[in-house]
């Protein structure tokens, strides 16, 4: 989906430094940004924020971070955070390749990758969020028993991700080849997921972990 540029979005986000990190001010000290010291879950590529804001509302005992590089959609997440008065959700406006600039080693308990850009052309494979260079970043910031939760409607990206994670030495704790056939009451829909499901698209989901170091 092409995002329409909104020239005012950056200034709007900058008006809320208590909620949005635009310039790396909290890099390396994310835990201090929250009111309480709690486990941290992050979503990379939050879009308009339906998933992450629903999670933060449902689980106040968890701290959440929304990471989104598009300022022109991130303002929608900010609006939801303000509307719901969420104190356990902060936002980073940056690219996933900068993850280790923000988070310390072993600081994160869970990473969500929901409907990431599949980058279907082979020459763009390194941009996929399950490419091995990104997996190395995730391994660095995740706790030893940390998890990656992944959802997509793109069969090619799902197959690529299974292979990439397996080759990296990860293992899978859950695999769903048609998520909505299983009527999972705990599943929280993203904006894309709702749209794709209504069209009858198959939703693929997995949960994965890194093997513990010996």
UniProtKB/Swiss-Prot annotation:
Q: If you read the UniProt record, what top EC class would you report for this enzyme, in one word? A: transferase
The residues that hold S-adenosyl-L-methionine are 43, 68, 95, 117
Quickly give the catalysed reaction.
guanosine(46) in tRNA + S-adenosyl-L-methionine = N(7)-methylguanosine(46) in tRNA + S-adenosyl-L-homocysteine
Q: Which residues form the active site?
A: 117
The pathway where this protein functions is: tRNA modification; N(7)-methylguanine-tRNA biosynthesis
> Has UniProt tagged this entry with the keyword Lipid metabolism?
no
Output the Pfam families linked to this UniProt entry. Answer: Methyltransf_4 (PF02390)
Q: Name one GO molecular function term.
A: tRNA (guanine(46)-N7)-methyltransferase activity
Per its UniProt record, what InterPro entries does this chain match? SAM-dependent_MTases_sf, tRNA_(Gua-N-7)_MeTrfase_Trmb, tRNA_methyltr_TrmB_bact
- Here the disulfide bonds are none
For this UniProt record, give its keywords in alphabetical order, as a comma-separated list: Methyltransferase, S-adenosyl-L-methionine, Transferase, tRNA processing
Q: What is its EC number?
A: 2.1.1.33
Cellular component terms, GO, for this chain's entry?
tRNA methyltransferase complex
- Could you tell me the superkingdom of the organism this chain comes from? Bacteria
Q: Which SUPFAM superfamilies match?
A: S-adenosyl-L-methionine-dependent methyltransferases (SSF53335)
This chain's function reads: Catalyzes the formation of N(7)-methylguanine at position 46 (m7G46) in tRNA.
Hey, which family's this protein in?
Answer: Belongs to the class I-like SAM-binding methyltransferase superfamily. TrmB family.
Name under which the protein is recorded: tRNA (guanine-N(7)-)-methyltransferase
Q: Which organism is it from?
A: Staphylococcus haemolyticus (strain JCSC1435)
Its taxonomic path starts at: Bacteria, Bacillati, Bacillota, Bacilli, Bacillales
């Amino acid at each position: 989906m092409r995002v329409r540029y909104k020239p005012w979005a950056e200034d709007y986000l900058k008006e809320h430094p208590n909620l949005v990190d635009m310039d790396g001010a909290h890099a390396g000290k994310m835990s201090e940004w929250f009111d309480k010291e709690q486990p941290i879950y992050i979503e990379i590529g939050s879009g308009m924020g339906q998933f992450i804001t629903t999670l933060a509302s449902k689980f106040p005992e968890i701290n959440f971070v929304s990471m989104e590089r598009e300022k022109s959609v991130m303002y929608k997440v900010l609006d939801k955070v303000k509307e719901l008065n969420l104190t356990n959700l902060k936002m980073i406006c940056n690219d996933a390749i900068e993850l280790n600039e923000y988070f310390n080693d072993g600081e994160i308990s869970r990473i969500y990758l929901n409907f990431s850009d599949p980058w279907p052309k082979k020459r763009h494979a390194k941009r996929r969020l399950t490419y091995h260079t990104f997996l190395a970043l995730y391994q660095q910031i995740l706790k030893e028993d940390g998890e990656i939760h992944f959802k997509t409607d793109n069969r090619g990206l799902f197959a690529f991700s299974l292979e990439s994670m397996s080759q990296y030495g990860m293992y899978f704790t859950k695999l769903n080849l048609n998520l909505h056939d299983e009527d999972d009451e705990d599943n929280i829909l993203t904006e894309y997921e709702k749209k794709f499901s209504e069209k009858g698209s198959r939703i693929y989901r997995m949960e994965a972990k890194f093997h513990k170091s010996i």
